[in-house]
A protein has these predicted regions:
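Serine-dependent protease modules
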Residues: 1-169
């Protein structure tokens, strides 16, 4: 399986006004280069680049986007890549330890640990996501973590880091 230090960093380029910069995270789900990230990480991007921990950089093509679940599927032109295994998110319990891997504030390949605080949450005031059942965690999730995996202690992905709820936004 994939080690936490092998989580890719996703960069995008837009014509204007935003320039190049690490804006999200993602994770490989197959040896032939399929990557999961958040829709909001890649939506509207003119070019998407994925950097692996070994510093190889790949251009990525968007295969599919799902705005209601905030999921994007990307494809790299590569083979024999390490990839994650999925766990059972339904089996996650409140109090379970979890680990988020991502690039908060552009600090690539960072890890943060915490516990599952609640299950079945919706996002207050956001009708687009109110029907989605989210896992709430106290793991430090910041800008740049979006699209990265949430691992259980067995090393399986049980969630995708998507958004934070705070009084400061």
């Amino acid at each position: 399986g994939l080690r936490p230090d092998e989580i890719p960093d996703i960069q995008r380029q837009d014509r204007a006004p935003r320039q190049r910069g690490a804006v999200g995270s993602g994770f490989l789900i197959s040896a032939d280069g399929f990557v999961i990230t958040n829709n909001h990480v890649v939506e509207g991007a003119d070019q998407i680049q994925v950097t692996l921990n070994d510093r190889r950089v790949f251009d990525a093509e968007v295969v599919g986007l799902d705005e209601p679940s905030d999921i994007a599927l990307l494809k790299l032109d590569a083979a024999d890549l390490p990839f994650v295994e999925f766990g059972d998110s339904e089996a996650v319990r409140v109090g379970d330890w979890v680990l988020a891997i991502g690039s908060p504030f552009g600090l690539e390949f960072s890890a943060a640990a915490g516990i599952v605080s609640a299950k079945g949450r919706s996002v207050p005031g956001n009708s687009a996501y109110n029907y989605m059942a989210f896992i709430q965690t106290d793991v430090a999730i910041n800008q740049g973590n979006s699209g990265g995996p949430l691992f259980n202690l067995e090393g399986d992905v049980v969630g995708i880091n998507s958004q934070i709820l705070s009084s400061t936004g």
